[in-house]
Amino acid sequence: MRGRCYASTMSQPASQVSATLEHYLALRAEIERHNRAYYELDAPEIPDDEYDRLVRELRALEAAHPEWVAENSPAQTVGGAPSSAFLPVEHPTPMTSLDNVFSDEELAEWQEKLARALNLPPDHDGFTYTGELKIDGLSVNLYYADGVLQWAATRGNGRVGEMVTEQVLTIPGIPRALPGLTGELEVRGEVYLSRADFAAFNARAEELGLPLLKNPRNGAAGALRQKDPEVTRTRHLKALFYSLGKHDGVPVRTQGEVLAWLAEQGFPTSRYSETFTGLQAAADYHRRMTAQRAQFEFDADGTVLKLDSLALQAEAGSTSRAPRWAVAYKFPVEEVETVLESITVNVGRTGKLAPLAHLSPRLIEGSTVSKATLHNEDYIRDLDLRIGDTVVVRKSGGVIPQIMRVVLEKRPPDAAPYRFPTHCPECGHEVVRAEGDANTYCPNPACPAQQFERLRYFVSRGAMDVRGVGEKLIEQLLATGLVHDAADLYQLTAEQLASLERSGEKKAANILAQLEASKTRPLWRLINALGINHVGERNAQALARAFGTLDALLAATPESIEAVPGLGRTIAQSVSAALADPSMQDLIRRLRERGLKPVEETAPRGDALAGLSFVLTGTLSRPRDEIKARLESAGARVTGSVTKKTSYLIAGEEAGSKLDRARELGIPVLDEAGLGALLEERGV
């Protein structure tokens, strides 16, 4: 959560900043633009530390010139406008932000202000605090009435948020009901995308040629704002809860008791929270967390220190934007200088040229960094990167190494501008770059690098799943000329395979058996294996369900492909162009000649389940998306929550609160076998 936390004016006298009204208004406009990018578009344009610097300057100007301050100043407000794509919901108690401090000295100044607010001497140091991590995610508020969850909403502007109930309920560990509670209850927490899930998503997106997430916070915000909660579910969001708004009848007196009560009710809470007394203990906690930040499963950009006593919190009160009894102590942005030793350019299966920076190894946030992605030619040119340059590197979002800038005063006198390849580094073919496209491609389908990557993808587990055909074998097959593309795999003989290095008759027989078995894989696997840009497992399954047979897909128009749920124009154009390409048509023809007969999908009747509403829960043997698409293609509606209007609950292993809710309402519950029987009965 950038939070958004607002920077304190501590340690920045107003005299140090320009004091013209014109500058003030320009600064306000710039911060408002960044707020829209961050809150409403989930597309921040600058790092958090740069944003914090701008807000510190604005607040210093407003402190020096209170006559300039308007009620809607970004230094006086919280968050951004709720999205019009979701229903607005008003928080019973406002979700305020936090002030920031950046040093022990600023922390001491903040405590002095707190003491004055409580009519205590400024040097009072007997406060007991609870320390927590400041997770870089998306704040949410869960509202319960008489123990039953009514809605979940984002922070929004602090007063009004976006209702995201079904999306939030895809997150593990969120209770639908809290037995025994009466009155109103608000539970606040942070939704996040773990570093591991962020890396896995980007690796998959890069493989499919899709846009990458900039950082885990963007990933969490984008996933939570998906209109379809089943899409949210596939992003594997998590949440940690840390505070209460209204809390009728909840017997808590301290923040420590709040965290303990939340854990008792089943809410996920952080294991990094601690309670301590005094300023030195607070600073020590912050230093310990700073040292451990590389080990967290999520991104965190600081610690939060809260007065432990809820009574003292109420007495200290809040400003219009932040409580006086809590503060965010930001982690330092860890940047290191290193040397750009070289730039290599790799070629992917689509022919895309991907430049990679090789750096002198340096330790950043607990791990050694020696490489950084350079994205494309424009990225290199905009930074004016040159071999031998000293560059500043940070981990973007705490995960991906990123070159931020060049230290020009350390540039070697003989450093020359980097020239992006005009010819493919693998095959020597002249490269191409379409107008308006940031990426450069090798158009040669016979490029060895592309051949290797296409074959590796074809046999991978998510495609044709040919076990035993790994990278080393593919390299040998290409080097010996036995194979040039996927169709050639199905002409290999036992003798040819046995003659290869580290092979033999037994291994050859196993590989041939695997290849034979792959000839009758489901249609979606073949579609995925063809390596069409923007088509991975999910989209391949959607295409297979929509068209049923390979011939039907090959005959499909761009308009009919675009009509497939979840695809859209860009993917439809990519699929149409790929299937119309003569080399792709030749590959498919030769695959069929060599025995590939993918198992066809049976197209269901479009109205067989019309009027029925289904909910899926628990662990199922097939992907939820696959089951959902099959139901919807037959006219059913699939939702994320059980209501009186639900026709059937489909329950897998470890079904939780949805199963309990269905039983309470008398909703029919089917296991997968029962669903299969229903579909067979309806002709689906």
Swiss-Prot record:
Amino acids binding Zn(2+): C424, C427, C442, C447
Protein name: DNA ligase
Pfam families: BRCT (PF00533), DNA_ligase_aden (PF01653), DNA_ligase_OB (PF03120), DNA_ligase_ZBD (PF03119), HHH_2 (PF12826), HHH_5 (PF14520), Nlig-Ia (PF22745)
Enzyme class (EC, first level): ligase
Annotated InterPro entries: BRCT_dom, BRCT_dom_sf, DisA/LigA_HHH, DNA_ligase, DNAligase_adenylation, DNAligase_N, Hlx-hairpin-Hlx_DNA-bd_motif, NA-bd_OB-fold
Reactions the enzyme catalyzes: NAD(+) + (deoxyribonucleotide)n-3'-hydroxyl + 5'-phospho-(deoxyribonucleotide)m = (deoxyribonucleotide)n+m + AMP + beta-nicotinamide D-nucleotide
Single Gene Ontology BP annotation: DNA repair
Keywords per UniProt: DNA damage, DNA repair, DNA replication, Ligase, Magnesium, Manganese, Metal-binding, NAD, Zinc
NCBIfam families found in the cross-reference section: dnlj, PRK07956.1
Necessary cofactors: Mg(2+); Mn(2+)
